[in-house]
Amino acid sequence: MAKEKTHMNLAFIGHVDHGKSTLVGHLLLLEGAIAEQQLDEGEDKFRFVMDKLGEERERGVTIDLAHAKFETQKYEYTVVDCPGHRDFVKNMITGASQADAAVLVVAANDGIMPQTKEHIFLSRTLGINQLIIAINKMDVVDYSEDKFNELKEELGALISTVGFKPSDVPFIPVSAFEGDNISEKSSNTPWYKGNTLVQELDALDEPDKPVDLPLRLPIQDVYSITGVGTVPVGRIETGILKTAENIAFEPAGVTGEVKSIEMHHEVLDKAEPGDNVGFNVRGVGKNDIKRGDVAGTTQNPPSVAKEFKAQIVVLQHPGVMTVGYTPVFHAHTAQVACTFLSLDVKLDPATGQPKEENPDFLKTGDAALVTIKPTKPMVIENIKEIPHMGRFAIRDMGQTVAAGMCIDITDAK
């Protein structure tokens, strides 16, 4: 059997109407993931691919994360088509945080929009370290090299403020509608000497499997199976789960021995990051652990925070956030109400540099360093130590109001 290709999750980010869906649609078409007859006639034929839902067709807005798949020579990709509309930013949080790399789409005729900046900062906050920039709608600006270079310079300055090196980031002039420089070099841009989008996708670094980090396995469900015993189920974020190993569940505070591991009805000796497993634990009862607990080895158990410092971005809050505010934090499989103990420093959202000490409140668009106290102990890790376990979304009133990461645990269990 041929070795399976490495899998890569790809987020498409950028301002609404800059052509993300059209670009994804054309990419899928050119890479043979969809048949031509599936496409509508005329202007919006490629966007159809991503907008399968009726309501979306009417509004001409991409809502859902369309998990479309395509392959290149090197990778198999799942496209997380991240919506650009304001009220769909929460999708971007669940979407972008699953992504190994992002394609930022910027329209040549519009240039940098507020959302362009926001998405760059947000994707960085969510741990995306590989970026490709597609300067789209080149057909609208008559394939102007000057326009391309001007935007490339502006975008280079912008991405360097959040820690991307412009020299490491490919800038590609494309037309999502006409298909220029997507899978084949375009004769409309003879001045462009770089690679096509597909070549740059193939040149991305393989996603690291964080096997060298300590084991962290957030629990999704717990079953009790007759004749077997307690079987927690979850997806390994970091490290390796092995049979006969002693593991600790936090914040439950119980330990047990791994007797067996199963994935897709197949028995395994060990399981790696990305694997969805069920495993039988001796010495732990079904009611001792629950969704939101995290398993680690007894030598290096998960960190339980009673208080932590975080960097957050306020995405959409109808009012202001002040000290004492207690929304629900969603981290891995846990959902815990947490209180803002202090607002420490307001940051410039474009650069991450300090702007104001101890602000009175935070509002939509603000970035800040804050101190957080969970209302009950929860597992969260320092982003620098175990990045996969350090991110969270903050939800309130049925919407995602902020996203962030834990930068220090100041009081642990």
UniProtKB/Swiss-Prot annotation:
Gene designation: tuf
Protein name: Elongation factor 1-alpha
Region described as G3: 81-84
Family: Belongs to the TRAFAC class translation factor GTPase superfamily. Classic translation factor GTPase family. EF-Tu/EF-1A subfamily.
Stretches the record annotates as G5: 175-177
Pfam name, any one: GTP_EFTU_D2
Species assigned in the record: Methanosphaera stadtmanae (strain ATCC 43021 / DSM 3091 / JCM 11832 / MCB-3)
Lineage: Archaea, Methanobacteriati, Methanobacteriota, Methanomada group, Methanobacteria
Enzymatic reactions: GTP + H2O = GDP + phosphate + H(+)
Keywords: Cytoplasm, Elongation factor, GTP-binding, Hydrolase, Magnesium, Metal-binding, Nucleotide-binding, Protein biosynthesis
Region of interest: G4: 136-139
Enzyme class: hydrolase
One term of GO molecular function: translation elongation factor activity
